[in-house]
């Protein structure tokens, strides 16, 4: 039991370092993806591209989330593995989960992670949206307190977006202007996205691996990973777009609820809007796996334990 706990702590350490490194290195893709998703139809891409200095705005929020999420992931998954696996011997060792038990453990762990990171995702979105706003335009806008969106119509005026550049001021502003609800916006879309992520990734990876099982080489592993990432992004991007919109600073006056958000995007902006930012998300997802695995392996070696155990 002592060795098992020691290995778990080492896994958490290696996983946390890998998660923070991966989040930082791929954050420009996250910024561009979120920035595109926040733009209404007809907004030029050039509005986002030149703001290179802003490419790491909001990264601190996701790094805090990545650290906490990693701890939660290992502890939750470890507990679920013990709960779902009946093949536990006297030394309290258990065989790896397979099939539906693995899918259940992964999905439940993903939901717990998602609930944890929702406040940080909201902070990130607030900071990115703020970084994209022209300060001169903000001075002309006045806040609208009672504006409400109906199911079919947008509010006549929307709440202006504040210009905030740092983590703690963002948290303070969100609480003062929107209350505690500001940190749980987009919860429904986030949970659905996580369930879809886990299910599609598990299914797609298994399918592509079986399809290429005759080719037992590095190339097949790369192809499987890329094909899985492409499938994941293609099928879950609409949920991701809705999640981002529901986390925006003016979501409360723009959208009545998640379904209203989906409806209005479809009617007012067109079907293609649901796949905004998909290229950058694919780049992030494709690179993230390799970065995380590589850093995790190296930190595992430094800590003196096998990352495959």
Swiss-Prot record:
Solcar repeat start-end pairs: 6-83, 97-211, 216-302
Membrane recorded as keyword: yes
Main subcellular location of this protein, as a coarse class: mitochondrion
Membrane-spanning ranges: 12-32, 47-67, 100-120, 184-204, 222-242, 285-305
Annotated membrane topology: Multi-pass membrane protein
Cellular component, GO annotation: mitochondrial inner membrane; mitochondrion
Annotated keywords: Membrane, Mitochondrion, Mitochondrion inner membrane, Repeat, Transmembrane, Transmembrane helix, Transport
Pfam families cross-referenced by the UniProt entry: Mito_carr
Subcellular localization: Mitochondrion inner membrane
GO molecular function: citrate secondary active transmembrane transporter activity
Gene3D superfamilies assigned: Mitochondrial carrier domain (1.50.40.10)
Gene Ontology biological process terms, A to Z: mitochondrial citrate transmembrane transport; mitochondrial transport
PANTHER family xref list: AFR253WP, SUCCINATE/FUMARATE MITOCHONDRIAL TRANSPORTER-RELATED
Family: Belongs to the mitochondrial carrier (TC 2.A.29) family.
Annotated protein name in UniProt: Uncharacterized mitochondrial carrier YFR045W
